[in-house]
Amino acid sequence: MTAFHTIAVPHEDILAGRLTLDVFAADLWEVHKGRAPDEYLDPVRFFQKTYQTEGLANLLAVVEKRLQGAGGDPVIQVQTPFGGGKTHALIAMYHKAAEWDARRAVVVGTPMAPTDTIWGLFAEQLTGSRAGFEGLTAPGREALRDLLSAHQPLLILMDEVLEYATKAAGVPVGSSTLAAQTLAFLQELTEAVATLDRTCLVVTLPSSVLEHYDEGAERLFRQLQKVAGRVEKIYTP
């Protein structure tokens, strides 16, 4: 029997013992901020070391088609179990969007402060300012649509939304909470994106709520699924 390593030759960094465990911790936000390891930050190195599954290839093709204005799903949910490659898929789309001359807006819930807002981040990334999107109340669909429409083709990538919404649930906004405002915003966002022919929204949710979340987070998880599920297509990379 032929030894496996003569058929599947390991990368040089594995053979040289340079591969460390932190390289496996894919982080879309660190890529967006330019602070990730080169294996993720450099598009050439990233795709050299990425095995492109049929699911990932199909996902990239659908997103490219949408950004070109040639149809395709406007809202996509990437759903995998923990460690199933969803963040890796988002990073692949992030790099490909640059090849497709598309603008990119990135939201990752983990590093966000509880009082930060997704709409504020969008405005800041697309225009350099949060003017008109500074408050803790969801801005409304028309204002959001105007913002997105002015920056097409546009790829919006959202990861760890449940993590952020759980934190935002503790921030009061009048008789509401920032988590409730975020849910209203996500509904506005999915509806606005559906009306724009060269904008694609890709959002990740875990395939099931993780054990370390409490009952409040489980309710948010179900609400997020309900909001996103109205106009989305689910893909597994």
Feature locations, PLM:
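Mid-core helix/loop region of P-loop NTP-binding domains shared across ATPases and GTPases
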Residues: 130-162, 168-169, 180-192, 196
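Conserved P-loop NTPase catalytic core
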Residues: 102-116, 188-237
